[in-house]
From Swiss-Prot:
Underlying gene: rsmH
Similarity comment text for this entry: Belongs to the methyltransferase superfamily. RsmH family.
Record's keyword terms, sorted: Cytoplasm, Methyltransferase, rRNA processing, S-adenosyl-L-methionine, Transferase
Location within or outside the cell: Cytoplasm
Gene Ontology BP annotations: rRNA base methylation
Organism: Deinococcus geothermalis (strain DSM 11300 / CIP 105573 / AG-3a)
Highest rank taxon of the organism: Bacteria
EC number(s) reported in the record: 2.1.1.199
Gene3D superfamilies: Putative methyltransferase TM0872, insert domain, Vaccinia Virus protein VP39
Matches recorded under InterPro entries: RsmH (IPR002903), SAM-dep_MeTrfase_MraW_recog (IPR023397), SAM-dependent_MTases_sf (IPR029063)
Official protein name in the record: Ribosomal RNA small subunit methyltransferase H
GO CC terms in record: cytoplasm
């Protein structure tokens, strides 16, 4: 099993540097104020958390990445409680500190900016690094997936999670390449995909969708999102707010369907909120961000759980 770089091997910064997407829109959706407790289920670089704290709210930040946890703890932000774990388990994590209801939940889905910027994590096809892609420091790595899974299973993952129409061609190329030598680095995999991709010249790198698919699979991101939405719905007090930022159609579709089917969440966004042209120009990662928000309302007891 590949070992992800240890967070203890990297210098820690006293200042968190994450630039949050849709910052003003998230604050407006969650309505932070003194006395309100908000869960940031995807703490990351704590960019959104800082804004919520500045508005007077108390924040419980959850992350499974030890590096993110170390950065947040080192910053010693007042009114911030940091918990290690996956946001899909937020009910159990909060119960462990005696919290059963909160006033808001934020989920900023997918890989964080500083995970993308850290070449050693293996999320990017632009820089050479071990093929890892794990947000936590445990579990199956992307290298184990591409070197061990059957061709049909690889094709299914790439098609379903990457929405890649050339999934079979790419899976075949991966299997052929690994018979010659194990695929161990990001650039190695990206080159295999590029050679297999028909008609590629310039533009969006052909490895983008496959890397997305592998990352989603390795971290069970869509399963975590489904579980996290149910957990958030259960934790929110009446009048509490939920805000979810998705970065691709698979995530946004799950959020949309969940909010539409939930008997206890009233949507506050008829359509997903997107970044302004100014923000897109300033922060390219905001280009695909879509924010949906909802408010918890009272509902009769005994209603069935929403399936998404």
């Amino acid at each position: 099993m590949n070992t992800a770089p240890s967070p203890s091997d990297r210098p820690l910064s006293h200042a968190l540097s994450h630039t949050p997407v849709l910052a003003a829109e998230v604050v407006a959706a969650l309505a932070p104020a003194p006395g309100r407790v908000i869960v940031d289920g995807t703490l990351g670089g704590a960019g959104h958390t800082r804004l919520l704290l500045e508005a007077g709210a108390s924040v419980i930040g959850i992350d499974q990445d030890p590096y993110a946890l170390n950065r947040a703890r080192e910053a010693q932000l007042p009114q911030l409680t940091v918990l290690e774990g996956n946001y899909r388990d937020m009910r159990e994590l909060l119960a462990g500190i005696g919290v059963t209801q909160v006033d808001g939940v934020l989920l900023d889905i997918g890989v964080s900016s500083f995970q993308l910027d850290d070449a050693a994590r293996g999320f990017s096809y632009h820089t050479d690094a071990p093929l890892d892609m794990r947000m936590a420091q445990s579990g199956e790595s992307a290298a184990e997936v591409v070197n061990g899974y059957p061709e049909e299973e690889l094709a299914a993952i790439i098609y379903e999670y990457g929405e890649e129409r050339h999934s079979r061609r790419i899976a075949r190329a991966i299997v052929q390449a690994r018979t010659q030598a194990p695929i161990q680095s990001t650039v190695q995999l990206a080159e295999i995909i590029k050679r297999a991709y028909p008609g590629f010249s310039k533009g969006i790198h052909p490895a983008r969708r496959t890397f997305q698919a592998l990352r989603i699979h390795v971290n069970d991101e869509l399963g975590a999102l489904r579980d996290g939405l149910r957990a958030a719905e259960a934790l929110l007090t009446p009048g509490g707010r939920l805000a979810v930022i998705a970065f691709h159609s698979l995530e946004d579709r799950i959020v949309k369907r969940f909010l539409r089917a939930s008997p206890t969440l009233k949507s506050l966004t008829k359509r997903p909120v997107e970044a302004s042209e100014e923000e897109r120009g300033r922060n390219p990662r905001a280009r695909s961000a879509k924010l949906r928000a909802a408010e918890k309302v009272a509902a009769p007891e005994g209603l069935p759980e929403v399936e998404v």
